[in-house]
From Swiss-Prot:
Zn(2+) binds at residues 220, 296, 303, 306. It comes from the Eukaryota. Residues 659-679, 726-737 have a biased composition (Basic and acidic residues). One of its GO terms (cellular component) is mitochondrion. Residues 644-769 are annotated as: Disordered. In plastids the minimal PEP RNA polymerase catalytic core is composed of four subunits: alpha, beta, beta', and beta''. When a (nuclear-encoded) sigma factor is associated with the core the holoenzyme is formed, which can initiate transcription. It catalyses: RNA(n) + a ribonucleoside 5'-triphosphate = RNA(n+1) + diphosphate. DNA-dependent RNA polymerase catalyzes the transcription of DNA into RNA using the four ribonucleoside triphosphates as substrates. InterPro entries: DNA-dir_RpoC2_beta_pp (IPR012756), RNA_pol_beta''_euk (IPR050254), RNA_pol_Rpb1_3_sf (IPR042102), RNA_pol_Rpb1_4 (IPR007083), RNA_pol_Rpb1_5 (IPR007081), Rpb1_funnel_sf (IPR038120). The gene is rpoC2. Residues 680-707, 738-767 have a biased composition (Acidic residues). It is found in: Plastid, Chloroplast. GO terms for molecular function: DNA binding; DNA-directed RNA polymerase activity; zinc ion binding. This is DNA-directed RNA polymerase subunit beta''.
Amino acid sequence: MAERANLVFQNKEIDGTAMKRLISRLIDHFGMGYTSHILDQIKTLGFHQATTTSISLGIEDLLTIPSKGWLVQDAEQQSFLLEKHYYYGAVHAVEKLRQSVEIWYATSEYLKHEMNSNFRITDPSNPVYLMSFSGARGNASQVHQLVGMRGLMADPQGQMIDLPIQSNLREGLSLTEYIISCYGARKGVVDTAVRTADAGYLTRRLVEVVQHIIVRRRDCGTIQAISVSPQNGMTEKLFVQTLIGRVLANDIYIGSRCIATRNQDIGIGLVNRFITTFRAQPFRAQPIYIRTPFTCRSTSWICQLCYGRSSTHGDLVELGEAVGVIAGQSIGEPGTQLTLRTFHTGGVFTGGTADLVRSPSNGKIQFNGDLVHPTRTRHGQPAFLCYIDLHITIQSQDILHSVTIPSKSLILVQNDQYVESEQVIAEIRAGTSALHFKEKVQKHIYSESDGEMHWSTDVYHAPEYQYGNLRRLPKTSHLWILSVSMCRSSIASFSLHKDQDQMNTYSFSVDGRYIFGLSMADDEVRHRLLDTFGKKDREILDYSTPDRIMSNGHWNFVYPSILQNNFDLLAKKRRNRFAIPLQYHQEQEKEPISCFGISIEIPFMGVLRRNTIVAYFDDPRYKKDKKGSGIVKFRYRTLEDEYRTREKDSENEYGSPENEYRTREEECKTLEDEYRTREEEYETLEDEYGIPENEYETLEDEYGILEDEYRTREEESEDEYGSPENKYRPREDKYGTLEEDSEDEHGTLEEDSEEDSEDEYGNPEEDSVLKKGVLIEHRGTKEFSLKYQKEVDRFFFILQELHILPRSSSLKVLDNSIIGVDTQLTKNTRSRLGGLVRVKRKKSHTELKIFSGDIHFPEEADKILGGSLIPLEREKKDSKESKKRENWVYVQWKKILKSKEKYFVLVRPAVAYEMNEGRNLATLFPQDLLQEEGNLQLRLVNFISHENSKLTQRIYHTNSQFVRTCLVLNWEQEEKEEARASLVEIRANGLIRDFLRIGLIKSTISYTRKRYDSRSAGLILHNRLDRTNTNSFYSKAKIQSLSQHQEAIGTLLNRNKEYQSLMVLSASNCSRIGFFKNSKNPNGVKESNPRIPIPKFLGLFRNFSGLLGTIAPSISNFSSSYYLLTYNQILLKKHLLLDNLKQNFKVLQGLKHSLINENQRTSNFDSNIMLDPFQLNWHFLPHDSWEETSAKIHLGQFICENVCLFKSHIKKSGQIFIVNIDSFVIRAAKPYLATTGATVHGHYGEILYKGDRLVTFIYEKARSSDITQGLPKVEQIFEARSIDSLSPNLERRIEDWNERIPRILGGPWGFLIGAELTIAQSRISLVNKIQKVYRSQGVQIHNRHIEIIIRQVTSKVRVSEDGMSNVFSPGELIGLLRAERAGRALDESIYYRAILLGITRVSLNTQSFISEASFQETARVLAKAALRGRIDWLKGLKENVVLGGIIPVGTGFQKFVHRYPQDKNLYFEIQKKKLFASEMRDILFLHTELVSSDSDVTNNFYETSESPFTPFI
């Protein structure tokens, strides 16, 4: 009892770490046996107390935190503000994500701290609190999820879901929260299972590497050592851990007194003496040299002294102990305790959180504004960055506080601002070292609604790749998605309304009419426009759409949409010109289309050469209405044919020379040579555009002719416009070739195949077979010829279908079979025609043709002419009509496969088209204007636009035009080489006429000259400016104010979807904003209620200069508006006065120029430029006075929400698109902020759909060691995989080691020391890295275990090819010690380099093939060993276990070890060598110190990209 009274009574909590300390102290004092008795008593006591207490866990014990409500509310408030800023376009998506994660993370962490204090204060004996905080079960974060808040979760990809789970498990989760938490929960379950498996496999590999390492000797006699010194920044705790249990490599002196000798093991007493010495004399203290497994000289075992004390009983390790297996298990076992991966919060906290500086008191803050620069924080907040230390003063009422802000910090307040106490005034950046690695992360932003994409001038308009749609942002700017309602239609993309026009919503739903497309197939196709001014023709690459003609019932409109800078508008009064009015055709008054598609072509700069085709006219009679495919057949006649004897025998005629029947290609060439010099404008269309040969032909489809009205006309006037369908309706059952299913497009244009070519030109004249007797009769026909021109009198269209299929496709029809309409040919194709099938297999593809028609097997083959075109009996369709139409058939011979005698005749229906002499000019153009001057001549030329017997097959939904009529210009004056053309518009009293004016004199005045822009200026045309919008025209509806039932229409070709789209701007998408009444000149334009059409690309051309007044005529029937669009944003406006409310036309009163310059200042001309309608001239009045006003707003401007322009705030973000005197209308838009370097997807003006990718951000995320943590990190190091990128200075250092050390020392020394240095450095670095991971998880492992493993991993060198030695082959892996010994034994030096192998490779590169085979790849290893004749000396444990021998450890150890007599004398030899040894150590190995992880060498030594030691290999 007396003894017990003297003991200290300890009354405190005891947790896991305290228990560990207690046990270790007991062992030190009492030894193992006595300690076990004491621990038994503690165990009994614990169980007894637990039974008495009977702690149980109930749901009532889960106490929630009272402050949680307002903490969450506060976080929600911040999130709401953040969302608002994002909506305004003030922060971008990455900043929003970062800030959101940070807000909720901070809230969650704060709640965790609150939870601890809450338990401690309210209920310290709470079972939950007791269990988790004693470490018995669970931990704080798990309890936090039970009673605090679950917080942010990661999705399966490891990305943060920025919707936090606000509930805890006590309160219960909502459905959304439950689903989100399932992600994290599932991940946790999977992680646990994977972690267990991974840890087990790691242990197996580790044991495999070191299973043969056994303590076999007392002393290896090494003279190497590792120095340990607290001066290297090592903490005292780490210093003690490193030294205890080691063996000294040198005597240790204090002054002249030796306090410890070599080979003495270090206990706690000796360590304490070292520490007191260091404290007393920190600078004089010498480093302590110790022996470690790294220094042991043995190859495949280890000595007692290098290993040190055994951890189990505190004495030197015994001989025969399997320390390798112990080391492997010591490292592998805690693997299950390591987390597999940290909870990674979206890259926010990896760079270390910033320290905040708070204001010490209320007051006014002041600092030097010149020392700071405005910037954005990583959350998108405005801030100031100070580059040097900044002194801030805070002036409160009675005291002046001074705060110093370190450099590179962010100041979050403004100068002279009033701050409150504890307000955050600055943010100090976390210390970022040069070795802080970053990784680039991509984040995609998707569009939240349908809309049209716009951007500012800050986006490169040239895509990153020539035909791509990706653009880089050179600086931070906004992208806008203008809101639209999508009206989708498979055929509709044209409206009679102009872009930005308003209309009633029901206008096209009640009519039920189709709306057709007016934009070409693709805007981004290249014209090659030739410059005619230079000495050589320079090629200018510009984007342009072909000229086109619009028809709207009352007028034809010319839209030369070649870019503004490609032609001159002439302004000089000349008599040498004439004008062609493009006039409305009187006879067709009731129909909304013009009967002729006259397309005027004004070439580049308006220069016309001789024999230039100035206009095209496509006669609707020669149009193939339905979208079938087929063959055109015709023949040419020369004048001599007229006079040839008609009675000649037909056989002779068939044999007549071929050159009389020239092919269409030659004919076309003649036309080109005679009448055309500028081919590029028209000829290259087919190749480069991929659109039909005739871009003007498709009146129905492209220019808005309504299909139902066209069909009505078809039936009314079958004779004139009869389609193939109508012609064959009477013979439907006979030929079965109705074309109703042939509307879809077909494959490629392909010539008819060789098998029919013998009949193609066989019968150039028309013959008829009278049906009853199969007699052949020849009938001549009349020819129409111009003087020297070969003329076609009649041509035929024969239906045929061709499919080009891949070679591999499986056909569902047989060759020579007969099929019906809509038969399935392959998996995805169906036939449009019925008839005979012919299949031809070629090398690259399979051709499948379908010939329509009947099949006859004639009795006598010689009575049928192959390849004949035969008219059937004439039939009158209408008795009143005197005109007769003929139906023709085309007779073709066909052979039956593999039968030479058997023939059959294919009778195919053909559509005949007659050609007449050409139209009289008077029918096309009024005569009077043409007779103004006799010096210019026009003549008409017809040519066929399809080659003879080529298969005409359309890719697009277009109709084929067979014949084109061209208007060819010529003149008499020999000396004049060129004429000038321009467009003139005359308006007077409701009459509008548009003229093409051609004059022979070059004008002296023109608005603009063509500028040769640099490539960069030209590249602006890359961006898809939608000329559709500027070229469409107004409806006849009057302009009305916005109301509920009106919408504005804009048309656009949608490139990436199959169907075309209409943009409908409804009233819900626009908002009208009234000006403040007293504001001065609100819109900067003094006009009476102007209606200003907005150019889509206003605002794109700020950076380019150009001359004033380039006019792109957009001539329309209603608004009579011109666009003036140049590079410096000139907008031409005009006063529109209503002449008469009942009339649909507005009269041009006068034109007014307004110049909007780069700074959005508007300058108006006082004088008008008047158009004199009677003399067809422009008069320029002198303009002396200027009036300048500055506009607060301008058309096309984008305004963010909540911007204060006037007294009232703007309620919605958007683009200004109507400006009136007292108000303006905003089209709603959603801004997206995009930072520098972001990639924009899509084209300017392109329609995007909800969910389309909009922007890709690339942002840097600090990458520190938390990306892979725990077990994967340990495994990564052991397997020698790349961990981080190598720091640049370290890379240089390794290069130096490899190159210079061998060069300095030369010979064997160089390679020996180079490899030694490298290996020594890498070993220490690796040990530190692994320890860092384990210590971060609270796991204590002795260094020597890790050292044994690392020793094996780094013990190999690779023999290099530098020197040829007979011992090892180049590239062979050998142990470092073996290489050194071989080098000493040989006269010749061995060259080798250090290499690092992972544990798996080391396991397969041991001296024992049995051990390798038992690990992996058994068959390969054994086969290789047999071929090489390897010998296994059975030194390890595994080999003996496999073969059933005695393992060489413990008692079996004695049989394997023989005492060497020189062991006894070893110590004395070492003493003699000591002088040399210490010098060598000083030279080479002083830097191989055990330092803490602060040193950049040890931190980053190992961080190469592939294998860490590739520089040495």
